[in-house]
A protein has these predicted regions:
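Active-site neighborhoods and metal-handling regions in enzymes and metal-associated proteins
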Residues: 1-371
């Protein structure tokens, strides 16, 4: 069953009409997983080895599935029509030739849409609707918020696990395995991304590879960045920690990150542009002699990175052409994650998940752990 209301689907249909788009087409196949099929029909699939296609017009929804998914789709999906691909000789092109006969303009997600369809349907105009779909999904409905809260609750349990197991004797891999096992035991369906554990000099890497090394945690600054999926919806938090005695420079990094986080929370208000939130905190970090090297936060939902994106206003003309200001709205869910990374000294990032209301509500409770 889908979590969103009929009103949300009607809102999407209205936006398609405004753009003079006849139909939206979403596709999940082995190299592509489009969460919008789940969003509009409630039909959940594994992120691997799956197939489904959704045709959505202002009047109805048609879900096309493989033979192995058909019986389950009949029970679980909400759609006006559910088609077994077997009836069309397992050819999606055959189905689309029938369904798109009178269609002139089709809305797609350009970044992930297979190029072969352009060649097969040359008379149809394909138009990117990524901005429309991100805007629609950015405002969460009550049932979506319930699932995100559950994912965040599991992440909060993870904080407790980290506190209980953090030591100079444990390896990053051992800590990661203990954490991940507990997250699954607590109810997570899967991780929302590979867990990152860094310490010592390696903590300066924002996205290290591999995400841990199977080495003992090093003295100084460190962090654990992790999240889970619960029935499709994501959480994402970073728990910063210190091991042993830290230097004055490291103390200043930690204090500045904490101040930046608290300032950000104070700045979160309805209708405030996200770039202004980022700019204010970026200036604070600069005044303390450091640099904010990444966005201050990102939306959460069926995707790990959803709208809103809490980043700086683009500086270059080409980027500004495609840029659109986004303002904070009630029932947006997003991360706040100020971080500072100084080569040779260490890195610190504090990240929590926030539900926007009249005042921001923190759904997770990450804070610095001193060991």
């Amino acid at each position: 069953m889908r979590l969103i209301s009929k009103k949300k689907i009607e809102e999407f249909g209205q936006k398609l009409r405004e753009k003079k788009i006849d139909l939206a087409l979403f596709l999940t196949s082995e190299p592509i997983h489009d969460v919008n099929i789940e969003y509009f029909t409630g039909f959940q699939q594994t992120r691997y080895y799956s197939f489904s296609c959704l045709l959505l017009t202002k009047k109805n929804t048609t879900l096309i599935v493989s033979p192995i998914s058909y019986d389950r789709a009949l029970k679980e999906a909400e759609a006006d029509e559910i088609i077994n691909l077997e009836k069309y000789d397992r050819s999606l092109i055959k189905v689309l030739r029938e369904k798109l006969k009178k269609v002139k303009t089709v809305g797609i997600l350009e970044e992930i849409f297979p190029s072969r369809f352009y060649r097969k349907f040359k008379k149809i105009k394909f138009q990117d609707i990524n901005d429309i779909i991100l805007e629609i999904r950015s405002i969460k409905e009550p049932k979506e918020i319930e699932r995100i809260k559950k994912a965040c609750g599991i992440a909060n349990h993870g904080i407790k696990v980290i506190k209980e197991n953090l030591s100079k004797k444990i390896t990053d891999k051992e800590l990661g395995l203990i954490l991940e096992q507990e997250l699954i035991r607590k109810g997570a369906d899967e991780l929302s991304f590979p867990t990152i554990i860094t310490s010592g000099k390696r903590s300066v890497f924002i996205h290290p590879y591999p995400s841990f090394l199977n080495k003992k945690l090093q003295p100084g600054l460190g962090l654990v960045d992790f999240g889970v999926r619960y029935k499709g919806y994501c959480s994402d938090i970073t728990v910063p920690f210190t091991l042993g005695k830290i230097t004055e420079k490291q103390k200043k990094i930690v204090q500045t990150v904490q101040e930046a986080y608290e300032t950000t929370i104070d700045n979160l208000k309805i209708d405030v542009p996200t770039w202004k939130v980022h700019e204010s905190v970026e200036n604070l970090i600069k005044k303390n002699g450091f640099e904010l090297k990444h966005g201050l936060g990102h939306g959460l939902g069926l995707e790990l990175h959803d709208l809103p994106s809490i980043t700086s206003k683009p500086k270059y003309k080409e980027q500004l052409k495609e840029w659109k200001e986004v303002k904070l709205k009630k029932n947006m869910v997003f991360t706040i994650e100020p971080g500072i990374y100084v080569p040779g000294i260490g890195g610190c990032r504090l990240e929590n998940d926030i539900l926007m209301d009249r005042k921001p509500k923190s759904l997770t409770s990450s804070r610095l752990i001193n060991f």
